[in-house]
Every structure is written in structure tokens, then in C-alpha cells.
Curated annotation (Swiss-Prot):
Transmembrane portions of the chain: 2-22, 62-82, 88-108, 179-199, 220-240, 248-268, 305-325, 344-364, 377-397, 401-421, 442-462, 485-505
Homology family: Belongs to the major facilitator superfamily.
Gene3D superfamilies assigned: MFS general substrate transporter like domains (1.20.1250.20)
GO-annotated cellular components: plasma membrane
Official protein name in the record: Major facilitator superfamily transporter MPN_077
InterPro entries noted in UniProt: MFS_Mycoplasma (IPR011699), MFS_trans_sf (IPR036259)
Keywords, ordered alphabetically: Cell membrane, Membrane, Transmembrane, Transmembrane helix, Transport
Highest taxon above the source species: Bacteria
Length: 546
């Protein structure tokens, strides 16, 4: 059952990153001087003739991330309102109702008024003198500019809207289409994000704290495996070109997979629904204590947990972003990395670092050590590793074999520490005295929801930092090094400052259901790594395990 929910989350991650990878490029504005027949692919060419700039591009991600936050916060309330089974099915269904964005983003043979591509008329073809002999009447083309006149390929006159960077980016109709495209795409994000929170009530129903630790740690496999499945094939240029050219069919296939997953879950979950949180009717509300979402949010421990989860989420997501990669390029003084696939390779190394963390660091979560010192160690180690990545990028550069190799190695190591930190944070609600099992779905809804809010704020600030030199000078090719340095300093500072919050965390407890058995008072020292070989009752370190 836990595996089904996690598989649904894996499908979400795959679908989400596939849509990002098959984005394609802008349609570009055709003129009399255009010397090559354009090749259109991906959904971006349906709406834009030029890039709108870094900040507007990031603003789309901010909007979607904030919507994911809202969905995550509400997911716990939905369990109380509809019961676990129906709450999960609603969110899987929400992922499926995104399908209108396929229609909105497809040119539909040039008949979609919300896109820029139109069947070329003979009159327009004759004006594109350098490529007219290579064009056919009815061929899909983007907007054309002849002199001061701008028109669609079918001859319809249009006016282009300027973006924040001064570029003419599209028509009012295509911008409207893009807005609808993002709205329906957001349903994938809202529905998919909540599934990782819905894996937690299943874990909470387990009697063994050790099993809870193992499955909480394994939850991250969903994201990491999904990203690797997407990124690895795109290292082959032919795969990327094919997927981008056929993006509608690729995404349609993904939506059908999610729908199939919904049907499988509905069939299987019906057999075990009685074991999980049920809808709170007036009758059973009077027989049991109903968890209050507001009362949980008012607790000081909740906000401490949210702060730590927020910084942890920033740590996990930031190295996956274009902002981080651009920052590394800026401090290395290079316009581009040594190989075109540098960013996908670093993405894969970061998420594959989870393997290192899973076997080397995450076993700590199964011990009876107090978690505070461990959290101090992991956050501080991550700050040091991030600084090492920055130092290697600045001194050796991303445009050299040696520099990229060292950045890649330490990205993998930092990923191990980062993902193990995530699993350490997720185990905390199960060990805190004041949280009960029937509150788990609400708590993790808050954890994921507010974590995305904190990350969105961080992403907005760092994106503004990075683009500030260009905006201030009005020069789109201005050096972004000052902004990159500011973004890196903020990133490292958060990893260090959060140690102050950790000091005030409550103690962890060994629990049997909601019963607190014993407080975890054993203090961990950096020289104590016996938990790596402890295996229940088979050796002298078994007392370290729960």
C-alpha cells in the first residue's frame, strides 16, 4: 500500500520533470533575413517568440511552488474531511485533470487561437525571400516581421507584447494561452506533491519505530528515482529531440499512466481502508478526539519543525535549479560548462548522492541517540560541502575537466549528506511526545506545505539577486557575479543559522503507538559510528537500535 502511494509520487516526479525537459525554445520572429527554416518543438514555441527574461521565467515556478504549498497544507484537512482513501484518490485525480493543457499548448494544425503557430499563406512565404523556396503553403510557422509590420504566418496582423527585459515575447492571445497552460499544469504539482505527505499515515500505522525510520528514509526514493529516470535518457541528444518534437504524445502517455495508477489504488485500497484514517462524521467525532489543524499549527514545536524542514527543503531543491547552476558558472568565470550536458550530470550526481546517505548516514535514524547533535552535524557538514563546491568552481572552473570533476565529486558527497538530513527531519514527528498518530497527515501537510513556502521565498530572493545587475544596468549581458555571490552567501548562512533553532527542539522519545516508552537521552559524539554495523540483536551494538 505504501508502495502504491510512493509509485504515484514517482509518476508525478517523472511527469513534472519530463514537461520541463521538453519545454523546447521560443518560436523566434521570422524576417526577410531569416536564412534557415525553423524547426518547432516543445510547448514553449506555442506561446513565445523570445525569452521573457530570467525573473519572469522563474515567476512561473514561484507560482506553481506556492500552489503546491497550499495543496500540501490542505492535504491533512482533506483526510479528516473525506478519509484517507478518498483524499488520495482526489489528489491522483487532480493530476489527471491537467489534460486541457495539452490542447491549449498544441497548435492543432495551426487552428489554436491561443498559440503563435499558423499555416503559412503564399503571400507570407513570398516575403521570406531567403527561405521561401524551402517552404510550402500551409506549413506551420511562427510570427513574421516585414518592415514595421508584424503578422502571423496566415497573414493576420498582430501586436507583440514586450517582456521585462525589453524583448517582444508574444501576443496577448498567446500570453492568455500560456496563463491557462500554467493553471492546468499546476494541478499536476498540487496533486502529486501531496502524495509524499499521504505516505506518512501508512508509516504511522506501523508498530515498529525501526520500520518507521526505514520507510521514512525510503520515501525520498520516489523523488530521486523519478528524476534519474527522466534526466538519464536526456543525456542522449537524440532522445531529447524526439521527446521535444512529440511532446503532446509523451505527456499524454504520462497522464494515462497516472490514471491507471489511480484505478489500481482504488481497487487495492478498498481492501485495507479500515486500517487508515477515516472521514470524521458527527458520530465518530463524538467517540474520538478529532485532531485540530489549527491547534497543531499553534504549537511552538510545530514552527521549530517547519523552520528546520524549510531550510532542509532549500538545501535539497536549490542544487537542482538553474539559479544554482548559473551561480556556479558566474563564479567560475565561464559562459558555459565544459560539456553541454553538465547540468543534467550534476542533477543526477546530486540525487544519486542519496545512495551514499542511505547506507552511510541514514542508519542513524534507527538509533536511540538524541537527534539534536546529529542535526547540528549534518547541517554544518552541508554548509562546508557547499563552500567546497563553490571554491572548486571558482578556482578550477566548470569549463575545465579537473574543475568539473571536483565539482561533480563534491556534489555527489553533498547530496549524500543532504538527503540523509531530509530523512532525519521526517522521522522527528514520530518521536515527539506531543504528536499523536491521528495528527500525522496534518503535520506532514504543514511540513511539506510551509517548506515549499520557505523555498519559494528563498528562490524569489536569489533569482532577484542573480538578475539585479542586468536590471540595474539595462544590459542583458551584464556580469551576474555580484548577484551569484549574494545568493551563495544567503544559502550557506541559512544552513548555519538553523543550528540556533535546533538547540530549542524538544527531546525525542521511543514510542509504542501514542504511548511514550522512554526518552532518547543518549548523546551522540562525532567519533561514534557503531550504528553502521548494528543489526538488531546480532551484535554488541544492538542497544543503539530502537
Amino acid at each position: 500500500m505504501w508502495g502504491l502511494v510512493l509509485l504515484g509520487y514517482v509518476l508525478f516526479v517523472i511527469e513534472w520533470f519530463v514537461i520541463d525537459f521538453i519545454r523546447g525554445s521560443a518560436a523566434s520572429l521570422l524576417t526577410e533575413q531569416t536564412s534557415a527554416v525553423p524547426q518547432y518543438g516543445g510547448w514553449f514555441s506555442s506561446f513565445f517568440v523570445a525569452d521573457a527574461g530570467f525573473i519572469p521565467g522563474q515567476a512561473t515556478n514561484w507560482t506553481i511552488t506556492l500552489l503546491r504549498a497550499v495543496g500540501s497544507i490542505l492535504c491533512g484537512v482533506m483526510v479528516v474531511k473525506f478519509g484517507y482513501r478518498h483524499a488520495v484518490m482526489i489528489m491522483m485525480g487532480l493530476m489527471c485533470v491537467c489534460f486541457p493543457f495539452l490542447i491549449i499548448g498544441s497548435p492543432l494544425g495551426g487552428h489554436n487561437e491561443l498559440t503563435l503557430l499558423r499555416p503559412a499563406s503564399s503571400e507570407v512565404i513570398s516575403k521570406l525571400t531567403k527561405i521561401s523556396s524551402s517552404l510550402q503553403q500551409g506549413q506551420l510557422l511562427g510570427p513574421v516581421q516585414v518592415g514595421s509590420q508584424t503578422m502571423l504566418a496566415d497573414g493576420t496582423p498582430v501586436s507583440l507584447i514586450k517582456g521585462i527585459n525589453g524583448n517582444e515575447i508574444g501576443t496577448s492571445a498567446s500570453m492568455t494561452g500560456y496563463a491557462f497552460f500554467i493553471i492546468f499544469r499546476s494541478t499536476i504539482a498540487i496533486g502529486g506533491t501531496t502524495l509524499i505527505a499521504y505516505a506518512q499515515p501508512i508509516i504511522a500505522s506501523l508498530s515498529s519505530n525501526r520500520k518507521k525510520s526505514i520507510l521514512s528514509n525510503a520515501n525520498f526514493w520516489g523523488f530521486n528515482v523519478g528524476l534519474v529516470i527522466v534526466a538519464a535518457p536526456f543525456l542522449i541528444p537524440g532522445v531529447g529531440r524526439f521527446a521535444t518534437a512529440n511532446w503532446v504524445w509523451v505527456v499524454t502517455f504520462m497522464i494515462l499512466l497516472v490514471f491507471a495508477m489511480l484505478l489500481v489504488f482504488a481497487w487495492f485500497e478498498k481492501k485495507v481502508d479500515h486500517m487508515l484514517p477515516q472521514k470524521q462524521s458527527k458520530t465518530n467525532q463524538s467517540l474520538s478526539v478529532r485532531p485540530s489543524a489549527l491547534s497543531i499549527l499553534k504549537r511552538k514545536t510545530t514552527w521549530k519543525l517547519l523552520a528546520i524542514a524549510g531550510v532542509g527543503t532549500i538545501l535539497l531543491i536549490n542544487p537542482l535549479t538553474q539559479t544554482w547552476f548559473n551561480s556556479l558558472l558566474a563564479i567560475s568565470g565561464a559562459k558555459k560548462a565544459i560539456i553541454p550536458t553538465a547540468r543534467p550530470i550534476l542533477l543526477i550526481l546530486w540525487v544519486m548522492g542519496y545512495l551514499l546517505g542511505y547506507f552511510l548516514l541514514s542508519p542513524f535514524n534507527k538509533t536511540i541517540y538524541d537527534k539534536k547533535r546529529w542535526l547540528h552535524f549534518i547541517f554544518t557538514a552541508n554548509a562546508v560541502l557547499v563552500l567546497l563546491i563553490v571554491i572548486f568552481a571558482a578556482t578550477l572552473g566548470l569549463n575545465t575537466v579537473v574543475g568539473f570533476t571536483f565539482v561533480g565529486i563534491f556534489t555527489f558527497i553533498a547530496g549524500g549528506f543532504g538527503w540523509s538530513l531530509g530523512s532525519s527531519i521526517l522521522i522527528l514527528p514520530y518521536e515527539y511526545k506531543e504528536y499523536k498518530r491521528n495528527e500525522v497527515s496534518i503535520i506532514f501537510g504543514y511540513v511539506w506545505g510551509f517548506a515549499y513556502v520557505f523555498y519559494s521565498i528563498f528562490d524569489i530572493i536569489t533569482s532577484v539577486f542573480l538578475d539585479a545587475p542586468r536590471i540595474a544596468t539595462g544590459n542583458t549581458s551584464a556580469n551576474i557575479l555580484p548577484g551569484a555571490i549574494a545568493a551563495i552567501v544567503l544559502f550557506v548562512s541559512l544552513l548555519l543559522v538553523i543550528n540556533w533553532v535546533i538547540i530549542y527542539l524538544p527531546s525525542s522519545w521511543i514510542k509504542n503507538g501514542d504511548e511514550c516508552v522512554s526518552e532518547m537521552t543518549k548523546k551522540w559524539r562525532i567519533t561514534q559510528w557503531q550504528f553502521l554495523i548494528a543489526n538488531k540483536a546480532k551484535n554488541r551494538y544492538a542497544d543503539l537500535l530502537k
